[in-house]
Amino acid sequence: MVRDGTTKSRIKRDIEFLYEIGTLKNTERSWQQFMGSGCASVPEHTFRVMFLALLIARGEKFDDEEKIIKMALVHDVAETRTGDANYLAAVYVTRDEKRAAADTFLGTAFADLYRDVLEEYEERKTSASKIVKDADNLDVDIELKEMEERGSIIARKMEPSRKLIRAKKLYTNTAKKIWDELQKANPASWHLKANKWVKMENAGK
């Protein structure tokens, strides 16, 4: 039971925050301008980034997995207020993501995530921040492969720019190894080859 006004007020602010981050499912990724429909939403992108970041962290023997998960979870939170900006729009549009993120977390139970985690990510100086940024980039490559599997021609045309990302932007050796394997991987093999891992004697009967 809530007894004091300060705590009750804070809970109201936390609920506002929960509604705000819920709107990310309605926030379009701006590269949809180039790729057409079918792009992952911000929360869908964030979900896989968390697993990618954990995968890279384990490959790099980085032990603070709690920080990795928190950082991946909040890395795009500012987009509730700024929206997304693709690589071309970013040349012309200035977004105050730092202020947007600070204001989003202001007065909530999660204010420490901005102060202790998100600022670190944006500065890109620590191992954790580099791991999460690598995950952010790799999710784009995975999604492009999924789009290509569905017949997207523009996804194939993005290959030269993604090779440049691999050469110039990926920080960790683990991320580079994952990128290299992605070029050979079949997005459908997880279910097409399921019998290799799972006994399904009654399949097709």
Where are these regions (language model features)?
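Alpha-helical, largely C-terminal catalytic domains
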Residues: 1-205
